[in-house]
Amino acid sequence: MKSFFITLFIVFLSMEAYGQHVYKGHVSNANNEPVEFANVYAETGDSSGVHGTVCDINGDFKLQSDKENPVVRISSVGYVSKEVTLTSDTTNMITLSQDVTLLNEVVIKAQRPQYELSSEGMVTNVAGSILEKSSDAYHLLSLVPGIEVKGESLNVLGRGKPIVYINGRLVRNENEIATLQPDAIKKVEVITNPGAKYNANVTSVIKITTRKNSEGFALDSKSTFVVNEKGRPSFMQNILAGYHTGKWDFNGQLYGAYTQWPDDKYLAEVAHLDNKMEVRNNGVQSRSKTRPYGKLSVDYALDDESSLGASVSYDGTLRLKGNGTVYGSVLTDDVTEENLTSDYTSRGHSGIWSGNVYYLGKIGVFGVDFNGDFLWNKNNEDMSTNDMTTLSSGETDKQNVNTSRTDLSRMLAGKLVLDAPVWKGSLSYGLEYSYVRRNSDYTVVPQDVVDGEQSLIKEGMGSMFLDYTRKFGKLSFQAGLRYENVDFKYYDHSVLQKAQSKNYSEWFPSASLSWPIHKVNFQLTYASDIYRPSYYQLRDGVVYDNRYTYESGNPFLDPSISRNLGLSVSWKWLYFSGMFSRVTDEICSMRQLYKDKPNAVLAIYENAGDYNNMRLQLSASPTIGIWHPRVSCMLYKQWDYPVESYGTPASSINKPSVSCSIANIFDFSWLTATVTYSFQSKGNMGNVQIVRAAHDLDLSFYKALLHKSLILQLDVYDLLGTNDSYSRLHTGPMFETYYNEFSTSTVTLSVRYKFNALKNKYKGTGAGQAQKSRM
């Protein structure tokens, strides 16, 4: 199979795009501003072999033709159409004149659809819409159909955590999203069924495109103050600076934050053995973190088609502190046998260095995209726990446990993608390789509580892909094939564990069809993705929580694969999508007794089996005067979930769940206000059963001053304190787990000042994303 791909690679490099010419152009108006989404098509009588296209948001286009110097017509709403003769030796610069129709002094304007289907997914147009007045990038993304935002955590409904690109550059740190300003964003694309171009473990993609840079120096500073319901403050300061001149683009970022948050939880483990045994843990906890972040990047444009650059960043945690008390109890047949008070403190620190170099350009007819990456990540955490157990007889027992964990990960990765016009379409070929070395050390004092851990993981991952796209009239076709090989080696105390070391090889086909019917756009997709266990899930040692609760990984886990068939439909401000998935070797957190102790439960990951699921989503965003409602709802349903659960028939593990978000945006001339209500129903998702519906009410206020140079934002999250999460985990035929997380209401005030609006032009897309996510 590998030789098959290598042969294709040689053929790909050696072949010429027979009879095909590639023409490039840039369309602008009289003010030298790009004309986005202008139509480029052949003039009558000279259309043989010419394929129409559309300009991107920067006014740039590529056109393939088997004729030399074709004559094409350029048109766009609001401009006079223009005929030009294209040349292939340079970028064709085309200027359109405005054509404003006046009827009784009323200007007739065209409004772009809110939602559009791209060749890969659904596009939400932000530029010129009410979304530009969101309080921050996360708030904006929460208003995009299919995206769920909790704090700084993104989730694509029904598809899990996405990877994010900004201007084609892979985002490696959530801080890059947090510091992105909404009015700098042009559009957001959500891909729920990624094809062969993406790593097979990628289940969803968010692609953010921003506006172009201005010449000269630019500055953007934002200060944020947060108070939570406990009265604990947090502070964040972000400074972006850049300088753009000629072919050079320099950018720098400094970010600092001190954050505090409560972390109260309730956990109950129930085991139905000879007797019913129940362990309850009610944790009252708080955490704080001091975090510095810095990044430098430089780009150089070799010409209109080629650029290269480099970047380096540091993301640290100077101090991660946690403390709290866990109140526990053990019940046998509902009678309390003993009570536990567990006081703990934890301290940690971490540092992540990462870097990227890239080249993006052309060699002959071939487009070249190369990225090289490195990553160094070290984490340390120490914890001290004081347990006091009181028996029903009144006797007490005390125990002090100290744990220390150190993880050190290093990664090198490279990625090369070539593309060329082939058979009136476009063919892409990609190669990627990454190597990871991860050391983990975990010690416990006293040593008889749990076994320590000293492990080493070495993992090499190689992948290759082919992707072909072509248009047949109004029908767009894409097909791809990806091959991935993972060589995983696990060492315990420097000794190779052959039973736990594995080699995986998988093929991942993908295909899509897109077509319009009148003003309605349709897209049908097929793709498969894989979930490889994280290094945390593959660890071998046991982690001590308290004398009743322990956690462990499982080095014997197999990857889980999902095969997905999707349909999307869009019309103006309406969008619908549906997806059916077949999942094999689902990975779940299960429960068992720890070392046969009658009152100690071990949480461990296992492969459960196969099942089917479906999700349906409907979104609408009409405009009614100053009111801009945005409604998005999703239905999730699963069948034949493979986990057994005590006292619960299989049908009860397959109940549907519904989530809805209703954002009411009111755009007054002097203020923009948003009232957002979110709802999560009861139901099942995987082995998690939501046992109580959750409600969330958020408020946001946006005010721009000094020609939008000064922006004030006020946000209130979880105003009513009703966004708590109550879950039951189905963890085995003899076990039940109940887990509750409690929401925190916060008030946030932000002050932002910007000068000569700054956007980063860095075009490195990154390599080794699959390994970075698992690290």
Language model: regions and residue ranges:
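Short, acidic, small-residue-rich periplasmic hinge/interaction motif at the N-terminus
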Residues: 39-43, 75-79, 91-130, 149-151, ...
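Short, acidic Ser/Thr/Gly-rich low-complexity loop/linker segments typical of extracellular
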Residues: 45-60
